[in-house]
Curated annotation (Swiss-Prot):
PANTHER family: 60 KDA HEAT SHOCK PROTEIN, MITOCHONDRIAL (PTHR45633)
UniProt keyword terms in alphabetical order: ATP-binding, Chaperone, Cytoplasm, Isomerase, Nucleotide-binding
Protein purpose: Together with its co-chaperonin GroES, plays an essential role in assisting protein folding. The GroEL-GroES system forms a nano-cage that allows encapsulation of the non-native substrate proteins and provides a physical environment optimized to promote and accelerate protein folding.
One Pfam family in the UniProt entry: Cpn60_TCP1
UniProt name for this protein: Chaperonin GroEL
Amino acid sequence: MAAKQVLFADEARVRIVRGVNVLANAVKTTLGPKGRNVVLERSFGAPTVTKDGVSVAKEIELKDKFENIGAQLVKDVASKTSDNAGDGTTTATVLAQAVVQEGLKYVAAGFNPIDLKRGIDKAVAAAVEELKKLSKPVTTSKEIAQVGSISANSDASIGQIIADAMDKVGKEGVITVEDGKSLENELDVVEGMQFDRGYLSPYFINSPEKQVAALDDPYVLIYDKKVSNIRDLLPVLEQVAKSSRPLLIIAEDVEGEALATLVVNNIRGILKTTAVKAPGFGDRRKAMLEDIAILTGGTVISEETGMSLEKATLQDLGQAKRIEVAKENTTIIDGAGDGKSIEARVKQIRAQIEEATSDYDREKLQERVAKLAGGVAVIRVGAATEVEMKEKKARVEDALHATRAAVEEGVVPGGGVALLRAKQAITGLKGDTADQNAGIKLILRAVEEPLRTIVTNAGDEASVVVNTVLNGKGNYGYNAATGEYGDLVEQGVLDPTKVTRTALQNAASVASLLLTAEAAVVELMENKPAAAPAMPGGMGGMGGMDF
């Protein structure tokens, strides 16, 4: 076991906070409509230019191990916020830095860190309740467009295309983002279906950037039992291999020898396959497999109907234009099913909805109708260069997450105003001890920080703007894009409630844990001798292998 270095109390905290500041200062430059870009070096290919907080955070790894602890903790704030709300990563980072910096002053002054944490938790709970009161539901397409625009760094065209996509496939519909072929953003609605089952092995992934297995013009084998013996599959695999087309296998499960053989064939490029578990359970699984069969023009291979896997032919398989299999879901785009059969199936399910007695059954049946009839909206992002396209695509994906969050929990005034208005719920709050009161006071100062950062990035005086906004009421705030004060909701400056709430909760959670740390342990760096020069020409017998 390697030797460790241990630092205690202030000595540890100061080093850790230095790391917090390095990461937060890099991320916070991107906040607001006048936030700047950050350029990220890549080992291969062109650098990436981004305004996405979590993308910047993920790239930062510090040499000093104690500083790196701080950086990694704040990175965790950004990642968790991105996972839960899909946006608000920069706001979360700014809040975490503010809580840590303010908290450190109190700890240095002799306040008890545990009581400080309790005060912080009380203040955050009160602020979250106030945010819920401020929240208003998103009802119109215009509001959806406004939320999307703000999240995409005030790009109105991105907000509009997301609103159009939601109009076409519904707020619960499936929307995917792809690379475009022109300079303009385009929206296509493709007949398709998505279900919540992903690939059975990561070795099926053939698009590492998106972490998906993408199959173009595939066959679809639908089977209602487990597949564990590869011999059962061989006849149909041979037929598919002759056609030189990929294959998606949807079964109750694919395991053991069968899965291993499919993976090996896939890696070697002999037959491009992906296997997923069938969606749903029990009778619902049977019904969903039937839906997929009708959508793709195939047949469910089931012993109940007298069919067996060994005797399956290409005529029994479904087909689609494209299928994308991610870790947790599968999207079938443009299935080859007959339009009239799909219509009849939708009619049949709608009749079942009328007869359904439980809300749960009704909801599940409505989901099936949406999947069969709704389709998939594809936003194709256009740009002049690949670097610009990557940056723009990341913004579109962020905006899409933000609009979904807005539909889920509603919106609050943007531009850091909602957090300032939440101060009124914290102001009258009292803790059990003086130290808890200090924790509450700390949050009162920290919630100003997002607005201060937005204003600083816009080149204005932060303290003046914060005081002016605090003297106003309701939606009154500062629009950094125009440099004017006014009703931010009317001006379309909106933030999803879920994003603001998640950012505050995650920031306070990680930052207060950091304040209560009294020791830090890291591995000592070993002074290793310089590595020997590489052998010329590569190692024998390794020709043709990629590393």
